[in-house]
């Protein structure tokens, strides 16, 4: 199972590990709130402590705005990772190798030229 996780060969192993780890973390977080206090006021486990060295979450007025910003930045990061995964699947190389290949000749090695040259329609014989 560990080899499948390291080399990302088993999607089911990765999914099961993700569900177990996130379930444990969220269970711990939900279990550390007083009964009837879940979702009220500021959650003492999120965000803060060592993850908030500037004390940005101390103000209850800006806390909801910071939560929305965190969600949006997380979605943006996931979209970027999806691009990395798609690029790795198509080219068989990682993002650094693809970037270095692009830097060799940016006008010839880019997404548009790859799209035009690799997916050009081929002539079809009409019956």
From Swiss-Prot:
Q: Which positions, given as ranges, span the membrane?
A: 11-28, 76-92
Question: Which top-rank group of organisms is this from?
Answer: Eukaryota
- Note how many cofactor molecules are bound and how: Binds at least 14 chlorophylls (8 Chl-a and 6 Chl-b) and carotenoids such as lutein and neoxanthin.
- Amino-acid positions noted as binding chlorophyll a 3 in the UniProt annotation, renumbered to this chain: 5, 70
Q: Kindly list the GO CC terms recorded for this protein.
A: chloroplast thylakoid membrane; photosystem I; photosystem II
Q: Which residues bind chlorophyll a 6?
A: 102
**Which residues of this UniProt protein bind chlorophyll b 3?**
10, 26
Give the molecular function GO annotations: chlorophyll binding; metal ion binding
Q: Where does chlorophyll b 4 bind?
A: 18, 29
List where in the cell it is found: Plastid, Chloroplast thylakoid membrane
Which InterPro entries does the entry mention?
Chloro_AB-bd_pln, Chloroa_b-bind
Its PTM note reads: Photoregulated by reversible phosphorylation of its threonine residues.
Mind telling me which Gene3D superfamilies this protein's record contains?
A: Chlorophyll a/b binding protein domain
The subunit structure is:
The LHC complex consists of chlorophyll a-b binding proteins.
- Function in brief: The light-harvesting complex (LHC) functions as a light receptor, it captures and delivers excitation energy to photosystems with which it is closely associated.
| Name used for this protein in its record | Chlorophyll a-b binding protein of LHCII type 1
Specify the species.
Euglena gracilis
